[in-house]
Amino acid sequence: MDCKATVKLGAFSRDGKTRGDYKASDHDFGSTEHYVPCGLLEEDTAQLYVTFGSSAKTSDFIVDTLTAWWQGLSAKAQGAIDRVQLKMDNGPESSGVRTQFLQRMGHLVDTIGKPIQLRYYPPYHSKYNPIERCWGILE
């Protein structure tokens, strides 16, 4: 599971760069629309679940994404899972010492009735997280 930096939308989504001819706009007001992607990769089934939020990358957004993923599973799939294992980078919004994140995860464990195991990669090693290979589709 991982969240990425803000993704701009519209004419400025790639810093204004394009591979083809593009007619320039009359005025350059910049892009005000942006979204924050948060993704979850199920390694057993190779299914990618991506949510886009319009707010900041926070611990609440991460837990809300995980909750939406769980609710989207069928009852049979939920029953087949004995524990949820999350491989995460050690970012500030999902750190194991951040009380808001741990409190929300505790409530989620109580809600779903399954243990959640948080596995953190050391600093500067998030490239080994399998979800990192999926972010190229946003470019």
Regions found by a protein language model. Name each.
Residues 1-12:
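Active-site- or DNA-interface-adjacent structural scaffold in DNA-acting proteins
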Residues 11-15, 23:
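Divalent cation-coordinating acidic motifs and surrounding scaffolds
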Residues 14-18, 100-103, 134-138:
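Short secondary-structure boundary/capping segments
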Residues 23-87, 92:
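Electropositive, glycine- and tryptophan-enriched low-complexity nucleic-acid-binding patches
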Residues 80-84, 114-119:
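Residue-level recognition of the N-termini of beta-strands and the immediately preceding loop/turn
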Residues 96, 119-139:
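RNase H-like two-metal-ion nuclease catalytic core shared by retroviral integrases
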Residues 100-114:
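Short, surface-exposed basic-aromatic patches at helix termini and helix-loop junctions that form
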